[in-house]
Swiss-Prot record:
Residues 1-23 form a transit peptide. Disulfide bonds: none annotated. PPR repeats lie at residues 57-91, 92-126, 127-157, 158-188, 189-223, 225-259, 261-291, 294-329, 368-398. Residues 479-509 are annotated as: Type E(+) motif. Residues 403-478 are annotated as: Type E motif. Keywords: Mitochondrion, Repeat, Transit peptide. This is Pentatricopeptide repeat-containing protein At5g42450, mitochondrial. Its main location: mitochondrion.
Amino acid sequence: MLHMILSQRVILLRKYHSSANALVTKSPNSIPELVKHIDSDLIRNAHKVFDEIPELDVISATAVIGRFVKESRHVEASQAFKRLLCLGIRPNEFTFGTVIGSSTTSRDVKLGKQLHCYALKMGLASNVFVGSAVLNCYVKLSTLTDARRCFDDTRDPNVVSITNLISGYLKKHEFEEALSLFRAMPERSVVTWNAVIGGFSQTGRNEEAVNTFVDMLREGVVIPNESTFPCAITAISNIASHGAGKSIHACAIKFLGKRFNVFVWNSLISFYSKCGNMEDSLLAFNKLEEEQRNIVSWNSMIWGYAHNGRGEEAVAMFEKMVKDTNLRPNNVTILGVLFACNHAGLIQEGYMYFNKAVNDYDDPNLLELEHYACMVDMLSRSGRFKEAEELIKSMPLDPGIGFWKALLGGCQIHSNKRLAKLAASKILELDPRDVSSYVMLSNAYSAMENWQNVSLIRRKMKETGLKRFTGCSWIEVRDQIRVFVNADKNNELKDEVYRMLALVSQHLEENECWKDL
């Protein structure tokens, strides 16, 4: 049956190929039409079509190259371009734009630069179509200096070129350059606004992202779309501003109406969970049709429950996903459920999910460093040090300092001296200048009442010039930030603060609340 189908496809292709001469003479668009109809499985034979068409022109050749690019056959695309040159056909701006785009996708910056040089030689580099393709290549694969030079050389750069350069500046944290270019634009499209909002959000400049979104609304020229709101909501999620986030949610309802897509809902699920409001997070999740929910939707719910101390609900959500959908858990899903089990004390369940990930999912890349670290931490916290040590020995990855810190933390809780000594030696071996490692070691030895080693650690810190960072915390009361520094004697309210601290400590001691902390 399969042989018959393949034979029919070959016969059909030969039929198209045999009539190529006639098609060429009738219409300059006939060859692109022919290329468009070639079956994907037989795309290799398009090269034969390219070679044997007697009156091949730049339009036909560009169409063939474009088809190679569409099929992600970038090597063949560059070979076809070379063949075009050998045949003496002069490439136009669309040929260059297509093949330079191919070099960007295949991450071949050397080829991209060669094509740019050839376009310069032919006087096409200043063309906006070629310039946009070269600029995109340099932004993604080379330096912003090259990209800016290309931008300045482009005649009448379009909004795509400007947006690409702005995105490049933001990714490299060159915010002033990005904003200067953005403000100088005579017209800003929604794509450009989205690039700036998303760029700020992705680089941790969340307040600037939200302010840019507000500026967009204030100008009232461009209407935000379904790509704008995930960027703005993600930014407001990162600063956990519940009131502002609800306002953006209301804006999304106003501007999008029924055009809410899965990306908007997923960002809202994550936002409400980060604000500790799992009820509204679940409402947003339930607004999605079952067939709309993707792995990000489920991961957001699992992680939301886990981070908010509702480990059993996180596990239940994971089980519901496995049972009711055809979605395969990814590494984010597995880490979320392990994190939930770890902090909810569900050790057996955590072990079960970890073993399933190892044995059942047939994906060698599913478990990463963080998954093993989470399991080591889980076993160490529960006092199962032998199993933790065996897990580290059986790891396919080289354990880093994070593993040994997790192990040392568990040793500190359960006073396991032998394993603590092993973890301590590994930590100091891997990073002898890490202050937090020395602090952890000192605390671990103190918990085990090993005062000699505590003294040794402190002496070593002093000899190497390392200083422990002073602990501090802060709270917001009536729009004022109050900062508390460890052992602070300079605060004007220090007497009242320490008096209240003593009362709170006494209350916790009398009611045996320490064990819950």
